[in-house]
């Protein structure tokens, strides 16, 4: 059975676990829509760098 030869110190344990963390998304305030969006991504309303680049289609009109 595999058993550690020596006890792992607090420093070694913490160094190993140093990269285990949650990543916070980089949010930017979009002045065109007044909402927050992820950097370098189109906002949910279709705006990028203050200009509308994607026109939202109205799915309810076809129903």
Swiss-Prot record:
GO molecular function, one term: structural constituent of ribosome
Lineage: Bacteria, Bacillati, Bacillota, Bacilli, Lactobacillales
A single BP term in Gene Ontology: translation
PANTHER family tied to this protein: 50S RIBOSOMAL PROTEIN L32, LARGE RIBOSOMAL SUBUNIT PROTEIN BL32
Protein name: Large ribosomal subunit protein bL32
UniProt key word Ribosomal protein: yes
GO cellular component: large ribosomal subunit
UniProt similarity note: Belongs to the bacterial ribosomal protein bL32 family.
Source domain of life: Bacteria
Record-linked InterPro entries: Ribosomal_bL32, Ribosomal_bL32_bact, Ribosomal_zn-bd
Keyword terms: Ribonucleoprotein, Ribosomal protein
């Amino acid at each position: 059975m595999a058993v550690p030869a020596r006890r792992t110190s607090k420093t070694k344990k913490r160094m190993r676990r140093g990269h285990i963390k949650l990543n916070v998304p980089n949010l930017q305030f979009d002045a065109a829509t007044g909402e927050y969006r992820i950097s370098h991504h189109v906002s949910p309303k279709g705006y990028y760098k203050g200009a509308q680049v994607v026109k939202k289609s109205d799915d309810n009109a076809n129903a």
